[in-house]
């Protein structure tokens, strides 16, 4: 009968750790879109109405004759003028200095008095701490995107979202936008600035060889996961 030779437990643990590190290196960085809601919405079917016998039908597409054509219903479109310019700077510093000094003169007694007149005890200590830190960030995003009204809130505000895709030289670029728009901020040209949109989420991403060139290789991720520094 053949005897099965088992690997030592230390070797098994090392092999498992190496395999786990290799799998971690092969794993891709998760990329979840920040815009989670649907990119478009279809308006509900209009209720069938009896023809009134006139040229103007008040129920046609929900568009009143003597009111502006601003979006107000699900499925209407709106142009978002993206004009984001954010600059942030932060700096901090701390400095602490503490010093202490103690001196005792103790008279000696008994036979020690002939050897030492006094016993001197002294102690000194110094504690210093200094730290500085700073951070700065600058982001600029300009462009336009047309979105669709996906929901109308009870107070009349419009929940909008939309997506724009561009295929340029085998590189697919995505621009996604979502937020809540107050109809009073919509201009006569049926547009609104992104700075006037509440809960705005703007996403710009791409897929293609350019995006792959910016991704760290699996061997680099492997050594990055096991490096102790």
UniProtKB/Swiss-Prot annotation:
It holds the Pfam family FlgH. The keyword Signal applies. GO terms for cellular component: bacterial-type flagellum basal body, distal rod, L ring; cell outer membrane. It is a lipid-anchor. Keywords: Bacterial flagellum, Cell outer membrane, Lipoprotein, Membrane, Palmitate, Signal. Residues 1-25 form the signal peptide. A lipid is attached at residue 26 (N-palmitoyl cysteine). GO terms for biological process: bacterial-type flagellum-dependent cell motility. The keyword Lipid biosynthesis does not apply. It is found in: Cell outer membrane; Bacterial flagellum basal body. One of its GO terms (molecular function) is cytoskeletal motor activity. A lipid is attached at residue 26 (S-diacylglycerol cysteine). It comes from the Bacteria. Coiled coil: none annotated. PANTHER family: FLAGELLAR L-RING PROTEIN. Belongs to the FlgH family. The basal body constitutes a major portion of the flagellar organelle and consists of four rings (L,P,S, and M) mounted on a central rod. Assembles around the rod to form the L-ring and probably protects the motor/basal body from shearing forces during rotation. This is Flagellar L-ring protein.
């Amino acid at each position: 009968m053949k005897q099965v030779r088992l690997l030592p437990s230390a070797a098994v643990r090392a092999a498992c750790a190496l395999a786990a590190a290799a799998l971690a290196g092969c794993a891709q960085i998760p990329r979840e879109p920040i815009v989670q809601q649907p990119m478009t919405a279809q308006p509900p079917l209009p209720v069938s109405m009896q023809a009134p016998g006139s040229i103007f039908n008040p129920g046609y597409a929900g568009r009143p004759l003597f009111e502006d054509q601003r979006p107000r219903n699900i499925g209407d479109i709106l142009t978002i003028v993206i004009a984001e310019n954010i600059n942030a700077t932060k700096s901090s510093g701390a400095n602490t200095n503490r010093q202490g000094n103690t001196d005792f003169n103790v008279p000696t007694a008994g036979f020690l008095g002939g050897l030492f007149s006094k016993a001197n005890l002294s102690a000194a200590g110094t504690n210093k701490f200094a730290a500085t830190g700073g951070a700065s960030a600058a982001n600029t995003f300009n462009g336009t995107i047309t979105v669709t009204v996906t929901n109308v809130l009870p107070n009349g505000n419009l929940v909008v979202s939309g997506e724009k895709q561009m295929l340029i030289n085998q590189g697919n670029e995505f621009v996604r936008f979502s937020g809540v728009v107050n109809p009073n901020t919509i201009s006569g040209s049926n547009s609104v600035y992104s700075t006037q949109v509440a809960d705005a989420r703007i996403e710009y991403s791409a897929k293609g060889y350019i995006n792959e060139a910016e991704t760290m290789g699996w061997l680099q991720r492997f050594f990055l996961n096991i490096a102790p520094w």
